[in-house]
C-alpha cells in the first residue's frame, strides 16, 4: 500500500500534534526522566493514527532504507528509516516534542559537566547536525512478528546526539501480539544493572534516555548508562514508530 493511499483525515496535522504536545504534563515527564530515565505518555496517538502509520510499512516511497536486524546482529525483525520530506505527522512529532525536551537535555548536560547546549527549536538543532554531515533522517518504523526481538542498544548516529528520544507503540498488546515488551537497562557505577519494563498500550509513547543521564547520589552527581530493546514477540505482529531528534551520518 502506498503512502498516498492513506486517507489524510486519519493522520493528525502538524498543528494538531503541537496542540497535543502542549497539553502534556511536562513537569511529570521531567520528574520521571530524572527518576527512572523514562516517562510514559498515554494515548499520544489515536488508534486510527496508529493503524495508518503501521500501514505505511510496505510503501517504499516514504523510506530511505530497510534494515533486516538479523543480518547485523541487532536481533530479529526489521525496520525502515523514513526519508525527507518526512510524513507530516512524523515531522510534527519531532518539531512539537523537542522544545519541551530541550530544557531537560540542557539541564542534564550541565549536571554531567558537558558544555554542549541544545537550541530551543528543533530546526536549529537539525541545522547543526546537517552542518556536521549528519543529514540522514533517523525517525523509523519497526516491524516484528513471532520470535522477533530487538537487542539492547543505543541510537547514536554521530557527534551530535540529542539525549532523549521517543517510541510510540502502534499495535495493541493481547490483540495484535503477545510478548514484545519495551525493556530498558541502566548500568550504574560499582552496582549491578537495573532493568525496567514499560507497559505500553496502542498509541502510548515512552520518552526515554538515549545513552547517558545524570543521577544525584549521596556524594554528588554520577553518570548512568542506559540501553533499550524489545523482548521476544511470542505471537502476532508488532509495529512501533521511533522519533529520534538527531540525524545520522
Annotate the PLM regions.
Residues 143-146, 158-176:
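Short, conserved beta-strand element in jelly-roll/cupin
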Residues 28-126:
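Non-heme Fe(II)/2-oxoglutarate
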Residues 1-35:
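Fe(II)/2-oxoglutarate
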Residues 39, 134-146:
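A short glycine-rich, His/Asp/Glu-containing loop-to-beta-strand
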Residues 162, 173, 177-249:
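Catalytic core of Fe(II)/2-oxoglutarate
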Residues 150-157:
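Histidine-centered catalytic micro-motifs
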Residues 84-95, 127, 146-148, 162-163, ...:
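Generic detector of contiguous secondary-structure segments
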Residues 140-141, 166-168, 241-245:
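A structural signal for short, well-ordered beta-strand segments
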